[in-house]
């Protein structure tokens, strides 16, 4: 099963708020997830990310989406070992 690190949309109309989650790639965007890794507020540009959890999922083979890679850069997340994320 392929694990993706992606965003789940929350909030109200024209006021989105996202959770960074690890979920199976077959699940819907706002569907079932395995673990919450952090939050991202696009309006206030605030990123709260648990770096230890993100590192754990990357080392287990989870693939971040393009948007989650950008969120990682905003939160100054650096992977400890070489993973596919850095390539």
From Swiss-Prot:
InterPro entries: Ribosomal_bS16 (IPR000307), Ribosomal_bS16_dom_sf (IPR023803)
Record-level GO BP terms: translation
Keyword Translocase: no
Pfam families according to UniProt: Ribosomal_S16
GO CC annotation: cytoplasm; small ribosomal subunit
Coiled coil start-end: none
Highest taxon in the source lineage: Bacteria
GO molecular function, one term: structural constituent of ribosome
Family to which this protein belongs: Belongs to the bacterial ribosomal protein bS16 family.
Name this polypeptide is given: Small ribosomal subunit protein bS16
Naturally occurring in which organism (per UniProt): Aster yellows witches'-broom phytoplasma (strain AYWB)
